[in-house]
């Protein structure tokens, strides 16, 4: 288990390195106009197609982290949990969020721009889109993700990016 956690932490650190570097300096204020938010491919712990921008912090280290995730149409983040709480704010599009061990589209909450969700640590949850969405996630690092069903973990899929 500890080897898996260490490997996950190392993988997260490497995956975020390209995106996190401008946000790592925390000794001054950060102002990022919308046209300067730079998205890149999300790390392999998310299904292919997602993009990420690290606005503040280092997701692989302790401390405050602010991420933006861009999901394409018909995107699903399968049921999973984190050891830290997540605070989601919808920037654009509609993100559907639900709790549980299976994706229940009828039981999901539709969050439009300005919508907010608080997901406590270890809460089993999932998210999906119909037409795409951009969501901001605030959390206390280090970031981790544990899929309920191992077969849903994109890091274990053949041909993982």
For every predicted segment, state its role.
Residues 1-5:
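N-terminal secretory signal peptides that target proteins for export/translocation
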Residues 9-20:
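Bacterial N-terminal signal peptides
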Residues 23-65, 109, 152-161:
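A short, N-terminal "cap"/entry segment at the start of jelly-roll beta-barrel domains
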Residues 30-32, 106, 126-161:
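Double-stranded beta-helix
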Residues 46, 59-64, 78-89:
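His-enriched metal-coordination microenvironments in redox/metal-binding proteins
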Residues 58-60, 95, 101-122:
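Short acidic-glycine-tyrosine-enriched beta hairpin
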Residues 72-75, 81-102:
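Glycine- and acidic-residue-biased ligand/ion/polar-headgroup-sensing regions
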Residues 77-79, 97-98, 119, 124-130:
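Short beta-strand His + acidic residue motifs that chelate non-heme Fe in jelly-roll/DSBH
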